[in-house]
Design a protein with these regions (language model features):
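Aromatic-rich beta-strand edge motifs centered on tyrosine
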Residues: 67-69, 91-96, 123-129
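Bacterial N-terminal signal peptides
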Residues: 6-15
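Mid-length scaffold segments of soluble, non-membrane domains
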Residues: 74-76, 81-103
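N-terminal secretory signal peptides
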Residues: 23-84
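Sec/Tat signal peptide C-region and signal peptidase I cleavage site
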Residues: 18-22
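Short, surface-exposed coil-to-beta transition loops
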Residues: 61-64, 85-90, 117-122
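An exposed acidic His-Trp-rich patch
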Residues: 100-139
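C-terminal partner/receptor-binding element of secreted or periplasmic proteins
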Residues: 129-179
Length: 179
């Protein structure tokens, strides 16, 4: 009986050790890590320096960019685009000078320039090492990485991020969308 208890105890210890090593080899879940970084950035927003820029040519009715910096690093950029039939806000989040997350919210107006929001759509984009690793579409479902538009959206978002970071760091009070 004692031998059985010892064998079971040893086996459980070996299995627990193997499971811990397997989890350590995989590393932490990148989505969970990004969510924690996102929350930490938003908690610290009041302490960050803000840089405001006017956005020209990105939307019909203009726009505004606000960059939040911690020391020399940009940790968040909020770009708001105004249009006749709605308003869109893109929030870009950065860790170690790398894009990690974009939250896009589009508020649709019931009538032109009314300001009365009748519908809102949201998209969430998760990045790791300059690659889009997850996209949660406006229906709340994950968009497949093999979907035809996935690579195009990734390229467009990375280009926008670079343009906004470069614009926020420039001395120019405006950022222009040059086709």
């Amino acid at each position: 009986m004692k031998i059985s208890v010892v064998i079971v105890t040893v086996l459980l210890g070996v299995l627990a050790s193997y499971d811990a090593k397997a989890q350590g080899a995989q590393g932490p879940d990148p989505i969970q890590t990004i969510r924690q970084q996102y929350a930490a950035i938003n908690r610290g927003a009041a302490r960050y320096k803000k840089v405001k820029k006017e956005l020209l040519g990105f939307s019909a009715e203009g726009g505004e960019l606000v960059a939040f910096t911690r020391g020399p690093s940009i940790v968040k950029i909020t770009a708001t685009f105004y249009g006749e039939m709605g308003r869109a806000t893109d929030e870009f989040y950065y860790a170690n000078d790398k894009l990690i997350f974009i939250f896009r919210k589009h508020s649709h107006y019931g009538a032109p320039l009314s300001g009365k929001v009748v519908r809102t759509t949201e998209n969430r984009y998760y990045f790791k090492d300059d690659k889009l690793i997850r996209w949660i579409g406006e229906d709340g479902k994950q968009v497949s990485t093999t979907a035809p538009e996935f690579a195009q959206v990734e390229a467009r978002l990375l280009a926008s991020s670079k343009q906004f970071v470069d614009g926020a760091q420039s001395k120019n009070p405006t950022i222009e969308d040059v086709p």
